[in-house]
Curated annotation (Swiss-Prot):
Requisite cofactors: [2Fe-2S] cluster; hybrid [4Fe-2O-2S] cluster
Documented EC number(s): 1.7.99.1
GO terms (BP aspect): response to hydrogen peroxide
Full protein name: Hydroxylamine reductase
Residue positions where Cysteine persulfide is found in the record: 405
Lineage of the species this protein comes from: Bacteria, Pseudomonadati, Pseudomonadota, Gammaproteobacteria, Enterobacterales
Amino acids binding hybrid [4Fe-2O-2S] cluster: 249, 273, 317, 405, 433, 458, 492, 494
Location within or outside the cell: Cytoplasm
Species for this entry: Escherichia fergusonii (strain ATCC 35469 / DSM 13698 / CCUG 18766 / IAM 14443 / JCM 21226 / LMG 7866 / NBRC 102419 / NCTC 12128 / CDC 0568-73)
Length: 550
């Protein structure tokens, strides 16, 4: 096992990365190794998808499957080894069918890629795990060095984050064949074990630029189906009655669940990254969408154990449900998996609803505590002139984008302290689950404009980017000249690709924490600092002083 893709990874003087029987996330060595094997199979599939396009062959089943299966290897998504093997077998079957289509056009069709003809050696997990050793990401570390390995992983993990957003968009009927072509090209190239530093750096920026397009179509899918989010108050306390909790990012799953629970007497609560759903008109119209429950994903083993109903996980993040003994009432959807947990293959939630009706639910309603969400792209753009007016009248000094992933490290209290230290004449724009560090606190307003503005999920960084570009255009300056600072927390691969997206668009002087990714060496961090001004957090006092004086 070698996995260094998330912030929890083991860090020692001898090197970084989980490499024993089980990773810090709870992923076993077997599952981790089989995910390496799946990635190799997907690289071979992408190599043939690139070749097929040379013959004008575009297979949508291949294009949609590839990023979806890649998504299953993201942190805290799928811990179920048999399903990982199933994805690998499906990748190989799709590859062989695509290869046959190419050979039907050109009998001499060939692909020069070490993954292009990969076959699984056995049905036995142990044999497959031994085969996977050929594809361990650090297998040639001694030959290439830590810097090249780090850049490869930056690209691989960044592309994995983009693949997740591609799948989220596809669920909503949004895709782009040019994006698929670019994805396959990059994925296939990474399967050749590239070792050119400049080429890898260029690839990381290409991934960022591609992801901006992915976020654009995802935004179109969400707003096209469910309307533009508008500011909405959400209750974060319990309401009496039977209940279901839904977590993750998949708004379509939430919509289907709301439709199927309407009139049943079962209330629905959002959790984690599903919180922004309350801002969408076509979702909040369901009166039994009663509120948001819990906090950051890392607290789920306590909070889910206390929730008196079933839980549905639609995407990341799931962690071991046996710890809180709720594994008999947590359900997985789509690419999510945990051994022994019931999985929903389709859009029918009747079994979940039946379980909710058999459970006690909340016995009484707590005193409501309301927070505000729903500052989506259109709402932010509508506020652009107001922001400019406040700046011109010196009522608004600075905007801090304070967002990203949450996690368990104690150092993450930095983000709570930073938020509460932001001066009263400054605004906090937040997104992703890092907001749970401070989103239930009171921040007041500036002439009626809330000082805490919740822009949505991690992918809604797109909205923040569009706002920044719009403000810069209206003020006749560059984005980096705005009174705007980005202080981002990271945990996994979606955060990595958001960072690459921002860097690829030329955004500079981003501050990140609580730690640097374990796969980035001091040399690579120095390059990113020199090229983009990217740096790690220090103390709240020092960072606040520096950012306000920039």
């Amino acid at each position: 096992m070698f996995c260094v893709q998330c912030e929890q990874t083991i860090r020692t003087p001898a090197g970084n990365g989980c490499s024993y029987a089980q990773g810090m996330c709870g992923k076993t060595a077997e599952t981790s190794d089989l995910q390496d094997l799946l990635i190799a199979a997907l690289q071979g599939l992408s190599a043939w998808a690139v070749k097929a396009r040379e013959y004008g062959i575009i297979n949508h089943d291949v294009d949609s499957f590839a990023p979806r299966a890649f998504f299953s290897t993201l942190t805290n998504v799928n811990f179920d080894s048999p399903r990982i093997v199933g994805y690998a077998r499906e990748a190989i079957a799709l590859r062989e069918a695509l290869k046959a289509q190419c050979l039907a056009v050109d009998a001499n069709a060939r692909v020069d890629n070490p993954m292009a003809d990969l076959q699984l050696v056995s049905d036995d997990p142990g044999e497959l795990q031994r085969q996977a050793a050929e594809f361990t990401p650090n297998k040639d570390k001694a030959a290439i060095g830590e810097n090249i390995l780090g850049l490869r992983l930056l690209c691989l993990y960044g592309l994995k984050g983009a693949a997740a957003y591609m799948e989220h968009a596809h669920v909503l009927g949004q895709y782009d064949n040019d994006i698929y072509a670019q994805y396959h090209k990059i994925m296939a190239w990474l399967g050749t074990w590239p070792a050119d530093m400049n080429a890898l750096l260029e690839c990381s920026m290409e991934i960022g630029q591609m992801n901006f397009k992915v976020m654009s179509i995802l935004d179109a899918g969400e707003t096209g189906k469910y309307g533009h989010p508008t500011p909405t108050q959400v209750n974060v306390k319990a309401t009496a009655g039977k209940c279901i909790l839904i977590s993750g990012h998949d708004l379509k799953d939430l919509y289907n669940l709301l439709e199927q629970t309407e009139g049943t007497g079962v209330n629905v609560y959002t959790h984690g990254e599903m919180l922004p759903a309350h801002g969408y008109p076509e979702l909040r119209k369901f009166k039994h969408l009663v509120g948001n429950y819990g906090s950051g994903w890392q607290n789920q083993q306590v909070e889910f154990a206390r929730f008196p109903g079933p839980i549905v996980m639609t995407s990341n993040c799931i962690i071991d449900p046996t710890v809180g003994a709720y594994d008999d009432r947590i359900w997985t959807r789509s690419i999510v998996g945990w051994p022994g947990v019931r999985h929903l293959d389709g859009d029918d939630f009747s079994a979940v609803i039946a379980q909710a009706q058999q459970m006690a639910g909340f016995p009484y309603s707590e005193i409501p505590h309301l927070i505000t969400v729903g500052f989506g792209r259109q709402t932010l753009l509508d506020a652009a002139d107001t922001l400019i007016d406040l700046v011109s009248r010196e009522k608004l000094r600075h905007i801090f984008l304070l967002g990203g992933c949450d996690g368990a490290r104690g150092e993450r209290h930095y983000f709570t302290d930073f938020a509460t230290s932001v001066p009263d004449d400054c605004l906090i724009l937040t997104l992703a689950c890092g907001k749970y560090r401070f989103n239930k606190l009171e921040f007041g307003d500036i002439e009626g404009l809330p000082r805490l503005v919740d822009a949505g999920q991690c992918n809604d960084a797109y909205s923040a980017i569009i706002l920044a570009v719009t403000l810069a255009e209206k003020l006749g300056c560059g984005v980096n000249d705005l009174p705007l600072s980005l202080v981002l927390s990271w945990f996994e691969q979606k955060a990595i690709v958001i960072l690459l997206t921002l860097l690829s668009l030329g955004v500079k002087n981003i501050v990140t924490g609580p730690t640097a990714p374990g796969f980035l060496t001091p040399d690579l961090l120095a390059v990113l600092n020199e090229k983009f001004g990217l740096r790690s957090i220090t103390t709240v006092e020092e960072d606040m002083k520096q950012l306000l004086s920039a």
